[in-house]
Amino acid sequence: MKLLITGGAGFIGSSLCEKYVKKGHTVICLDNFLSGSLTNIAHLLDFQNFKLVKGDIRNSDLLDRVVKDVDFIFNLAAQIHVDRSYVEPKLTFDINIMGTQNVLEMARLYDVKKIIHASSSEVYGSAMNVPIDENHP
């Protein structure tokens, strides 16, 4: 199976990349590195079934080339910093809304079998206790 993982150099995205690369799937990791880190995926760069694409989900032309032969998309690309969203609301809108629309449109255009769109912990509000554990209310 050929997978596209947007935001693949982030914390969760890099874990997904590693999981599927080690299972033998072809993985394309797309990240703009605004919050993701090359350190998170450096150990995957030598795998033949792993491809890193430095780019942005706002770039329709790039997505057109990348999504073309993909079976499955994990969309984890987002501007995730709440404080930054107040300072740069247009950037947040462009990435989180317009970028996601681009991913969905390419998935439709190329008849991608499945897409999983991730949210963030911010939808749950502020944590009552830090650090958060598995039993957190």
What are the language-model segments listed below?
Residues M1-P137:
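N-terminal Rossmann-like NAD(P)+-binding domain of SDR-like oxidoreductases, especially those catalyzing
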